[in-house]
Curated annotation (Swiss-Prot):
It comes from Staphylococcus haemolyticus (strain JCSC1435). Homotetramer; dimer of dimers. Its EC number is 2.5.1.6. Mg(2+) binds at D19. InterPro entries: ADOMET_SYNTHASE_CS, S-AdoMet_synt_C, S-AdoMet_synt_central, S-AdoMet_synt_N, S-AdoMet_synthetase, S-AdoMet_synthetase_sfam. This is S-adenosylmethionine synthase. GO terms for biological process: one-carbon metabolic process; S-adenosylmethionine biosynthetic process.
Length: 398
């Protein structure tokens, strides 16, 4: 029997990938600032390369943070603890070039927003977006996490690749690594099987390729992928270049915000272009993307669509979003216009409203900086809540 199959591929990277090192460092600095100053304005960019890290950006805060210490602790936690790994938290140089947030931006964002549980309506209305831009959120019912299967499995495999290294199961692995998963969909657009898995992991110099391939299948792939998705036709490419000894920042420079598709939906949904890491929640690139995921996930969980993509757009200094758009890809149980109306009535999508709704002024961001910001099963994130399901059901029936 033949059918019209469709293949879709997504990728993830481990926490030791250079770009992910940069994301984690930026968010570790953000978290450290938010611990003492929840009203801080942070736009923190990190560059990592051989033997050094450069921290730049704009930070306005009333607290003090030992940035080099935070950088070194983050690098140590990732696993770059010896010079032979190509990067060493003890001997690397840490350079800083930090300015304050531009007063031209600050005056349009927030004049007097104070950190307290009960933010007044006047303060919410007075808090404008930190920039113009468009953000997307997405959800699908093809997995229990409301994420597309290719990116979900990619993250699970990347996390497992890191875990077997840190737990000493495969102690010859090194921190840098990448995973890619190709899923085959059937004629009903449901996941049917895994067509291809690609794993590349940095490793010690004296390990044979055949051992790496066998160990990664046994300890990473088979324990992670749900039974029935791998079959005799599934293709495996494990360290297909044959050698991956030089890795991390020694192999490639890393920059904050270079893995925006890994951070979101693996290319399965659209992306507005703005990254997340290193940005405080007044930056709608981050907070509005979280809110859009929150909206989309609750719509799908309410049974109002099998898939849902939400677009939000903002103008700098303006509180209300300039547009809200919803696409259910012809899977909606009610019209998209009804969904937009229900969302407008039940979600406060102004920047300060999002911060209040999702309680975003806390140091919760470093844990999002590797293995995805959405659909996580290992950490609890406020934009993954399903507390609007009944509200949305009632709203579309009214």
């Amino acid at each position: 029997m033949t059918y019209n199959k469709r293949l879709f591929t997504s990728e993830s990277v481990t926490e030791g990938h250079p770009d992910k090192i940069a994301d984690q460092v930026s968010d570790a600095i953000l978290d450290e600032i938010l611990k003492d100053d929840p009203n801080a304005r942070v736009a923190c960019e990190t560059t990592v390369t051989t033997g050094m890290a450069l921290i730049s950006g704009e930070i306005s805060t009333s607290t003090y943070v030992d940035i080099p210490k935070v950088v070194r602790e983050t690098i140590k936690g990732i696993g770059y603890t010896r010079a032979k790994y190509g990067y060493d938290y003890q001997t690397m140089a840490v350079l800083t070039a930090i300015d304050e947030q531009s007063p031209d931006i600050a005056q349009g964002v927030d004049k007097a927003l104070e950190y307290r549980n009960d933010i007044s309506e006047e303060e919410i209305e007075a808090t404008g977006a930190g920039d113009q831009g468009l953000m997307f959120g997405y959800a699908t019912n093809e997995t229990e996490t409301y994420m597309p299967l290719p990116i979900f499995l990619s993250h699970q495999l990347a996390k497992r690749l890191s875990d077997v290294r840190k737990d000493g199961i495969l102690n010859y692995l090194r921190p840098d690594g990448k995973v890619q998963v190709t899923v085959e969909y059937d004629e009903s657009d449901k996941p049917k099987r895994i067509d291809t898995i690609v794993v590349s992991s940095q490793h010690a110099d004296d390990i044979e390729l055949e051992q790496i391939q066998s160990d990664i299948k046994e300890h990473v792939i088979y324990p992670t992928v749900p039974e029935g998705l791998i079959d005799n036709e599934t293709k495996f490419f494990i360290n297909p270049t044959g050698r991956f000894v030089i890795g991390g920042p020694q192999g490639d420079a890393g920059l904050t915000g270079r893995k925006i598709i890994v951070d979101t939906y693996g290319g399965y949904a659209r992306h507005g272009g703005g990254c997340f890491s290193g940005k405080d929640p007044t930056k709608v690139d981050r907070s509005a993307a979280y809110a859009a995921r929150y909206v989309a996930k609750n719509i799908v969980a309410a049974g109002l669509a099998d898939q849902c993509e939400v677009q939000l757009a903002y103008a700098i200094g303006v509180a209300e979003p300039v547009s809200i758009s919803i696409d259910t890809f012809k899977t909606g149980k009610v019209s998209e216009a009804q969904l937009v109306e229900a969302v407008r009535a039940n979600f406060d999508l102004r920047p300060a409203g999002i911060i209040k709704m999702l309680d975003l002024k806390h140091p919760i961001y470093k844990q999002t900086a590797a293995y995805g910001h959405f659909g996580r099963t290992d950490v609890l994130l406020p934009w993954e809540k399903l507390d609007k399901v009944n509200v949305l059901k009632d709203a579309v029936q009214a």
